[in-house]
Design a protein with these regions (language model features):
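Hydrophobic, aromatic-rich transmembrane alpha-helices
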Residues: 2, 200, 272-304
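Short periplasmic/luminal acceptor-recognition loop of GT-C membrane glycosyltransferases, typified by
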Residues: 411, 445-493, 515
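Membrane-lumen/periplasm interface segments of specific transmembrane helices
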Residues: 19, 195, 199, 209-286, ...
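Short acidic/glycine- and proline-prone juxtamembrane loop motifs at membrane-interface regions
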Residues: 56-59, 128-141
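Transmembrane-helix motifs of polytopic, lipid-linked glycan transferases
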Residues: 86-110, 148, 152
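Perimembrane helix-loop-helix junctions
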Residues: 2, 152-161, 185-221, 291-296, ...
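Transmembrane alpha-helix segments characteristic
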Residues: 10-15, 117-118, 123, 221, ...
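Signature aromatic-anchored transmembrane alpha helix within multi-pass, membrane-resident enzymes
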Residues: 6-10, 191, 217-221, 296, ...
């Protein structure tokens, strides 16, 4: 067995683990969405009322479920949850998997070894890939699923193998359980498979194309139905992302976001984000497409359609006001560029396959003669490629694109430092290069963002020091997730996922509740269950509690906390 994929995976994993651990545990740089996933996973294992559905149904479950094996050790190593290290491990493994898939695509096409190494390294070392390969966010898992699906479909275009088609469907199904926007590449893949299957068949075209389409889409449909049905059975809402008080639609409304006044400006942001992440994509895309048409190479259509669907979906949702202006939403442009660079060199030979389909595209021999998966020498003859293009010209083009790819890395790094384009990434400069003497507004904002959740950790330490019995503190996790993961005793908190949360909230004295953690009843705080039950809790204790402590917040976008003591407790 070729050890190269294992080496690529191991090296990438170590890189992302070290980087992620340094940023989180070393520099306290924590992403809110990542930490909330850790909190949800912890609640499923170590809350007062541990159960799997505590991970919630607002967001897709796979990012949290993948962390369960690591969170299980947090009672012995609290830093796993306190610093979100379970998310770091999860993202490191899956981003390394995405890197390995890019390597595998080059190998499957028979690309020169130097090109495989260079393109894989450029992808793995992209600043956005490194950052999101170790911060616990869903991007790593989503990219892995997309790259896996792209690789398998690129193989299927050649092999017509059912194994490749089913694997691509599984990858897309898992992608949906990672991010809802995986439906976009799934739909694009369905159209692609139906069209390719219909065109290359000589008999029973429609029936065969429908069968191939069903094999691909079945795992996605199963994931969609099972997740929606489970959510409906447990919560009464099939799509909490859109209907829940905690869902994305509610978050947009509570945050004051809406449809942009000028859709053209919103589209310009999306284009700018893609150019930051993939500066050479406008050059590479038409060149790769033209070469594919000239060679009659159908493989480049796969990454163009699938990753293009992701980017188009993100652009559309931002233009219509359904999402935020986050640079990370356009990260699919990075693997798209890397894979297109690999397709500049014509494919050589044939990918190893366990079982070829009837319509396998094997150059120079029949499918039965190639069932062993051995490689054919390819289409190259003399100094020409299969398209008649001089081999030297293709090599020069690949070298030039590789140089441009390397040169694009600092462009992405500089773009990540833009306060306008990269609102979640630009604080990295303050994290990596602290400068107390810098008095600029930009640095002050970056430092405040970098300090996010520091107050919640101090609050958790204070509450731990009180040595309260289980179930003593009622708190919603809208903002409180950061307090929960930082506490050594999460069972002291009564949270919405607990089956008796409403009873404790309605009768705190009878249920042994001693404290209530309150946030302002404004912005996202309007969705806080405590504010919905007691609208004046933050202002005056709602006549059931007295103010014990007020905690001003050092972090950006975080509320000033108030700790109330329940009267009669």
């Amino acid at each position: 067995m070729n050890p190269a994929p294992r080496v690529v995976f191991a090296a990438s994993t170590v890189l992302y683990l070290v980087t992620g651990t340094f940023l989180t545990a070393g520099r306290a740089d924590l992403m809110g969405d990542a930490l909330s996933r850790v909190s949800a996973t912890q609640s499923a294992v170590f809350s007062r009322d541990p159960h799997l559905s505590a991970i919630g149904f607002v967001f897709t479950p796979l990012t949290s479920l993948a962390q369960l094996p690591f969170v299980a050790f947090s009672q012995w190593f609290p830093g796993i949850t306190r610093w979100g290290l379970s998310g770091v491990v999860m993202t490191a493994l899956f981003m390394a998997g995405a890197v390995t898939m890019v390597w595998g695509i080059g190998v499957d096409r028979g690309a020169p070894h130097w090109l495989c190494v260079l393109i894989t390294a450029v992808f793995a070392l992209n600043p956005m890939v490194v950052f999101y390969g170790g911060n616990g966010m869903s991007e790593a898992l989503f990219l892995f699923c997309c790259c896996w699906a792209v690789r398998r479909l690129m193989r299927w275009v050649r092999t017509d193998g059912v194994h490749d088609l089913v694997a691509a469907g599984i990858a897309l199904g898992l992608g949906y359980l990672t991010r809802y926007d995986a439906l976009a590449p799934a739909m694009a893949a369905g159209v692609l498979v139906f069209g390719f299957s219909y065109r290359r068949r000589t008999t029973q075209r429609t029936a065969g194309a429908v069968m191939d389409f069903a094999l691909l889409i079945a795992p996605v449909a199963l994931a969609f139905v099972v997740w929606a049905a489970t959510s409906w059975l447990i919560t009464g809402q099939a799509f909490q992302q859109f209907t829940s008080q905690y869902g994305n639609s509610a978050i947009l409304q509570q945050s004051g976001a809406g449809e942009p006044d000028h859709p053209l400006e919103a589209a310009q942001y999306s284009i700018g984000a893609m150019l930051i992440l993939a500066p050479i994509l406008p050059l590479l895309l038409p060149v790769a497409a033209a070469l594919a048409v000239r060679r009659r190479d159908r493989q480049p259509a796969v990454p163009i359609l699938l990753f293009g669907a992701v980017l188009a979906f993100q652009t559309l949702t931002y233009v219509t006001g359904s999402t935020f202006a986050f640079l990370r939403f356009y990260i699919a442009a990075i693997p798209l560029t890397a894979i297109l660079a690999l397709t500049l060199v014509p494919e050589r030979g044939f990918p190893a396959s366990k079982r070829l389909g009837k319509y396998a595209d094997v150059p120079g021999e029949s499918a039965s003669e190639s069932d062993s998966g051995r490689r054919d020498p390819g289409h190259a003859h003399g100094g020409l490629t299969g398209s008649g293009t001089p081999r030297a010209a293709v090599t020069v083009a690949a070298v030039l694109v590789s140089v441009l790819l390397i040169g694009s890395l600092p462009v992405t790094g500089l773009g990540m430092n833009s306060q306008l384009m990269a609102v979640q990434e630009y604080p990295l400069r303050a994290v990596l290069f602290p400068d107390p003497d810098n008095v600029s507004d930009k640095y002050a904002d970056a430092a405040r963002i970098a300090a996010t959740f520091s107050t919640e950790r101090k609050l958790a330490n204070y509450l731990d020091a009180l040595d309260l019995p289980p179930g003593s503190i009622v708190m919603d996790t809208v903002y409180g997730f950061a307090v929960l993961v930082a506490s050594d005793r999460p069972d002291r908190f009564v949270i919405p996922s607990d089956s008796d949360f409403v009873r404790n909230l309605n009768r705190p004295v009878e249920r042994g509740v001693k404290y209530i953690l309150a946030v302002p009843n404004t912005g996202r705080g309007t969705s806080d269950a405590i504010n919905r039950r007691y609208p004046t809790m933050y202002e005056n204790g709602a006549q059931i509690a007295t103010l014990e402590l007020e905690i001003p917040n050092d972090g950006a976008g975080q509320p000033d906390w108030r700790l109330y003591r329940v009267i009669g407790s």
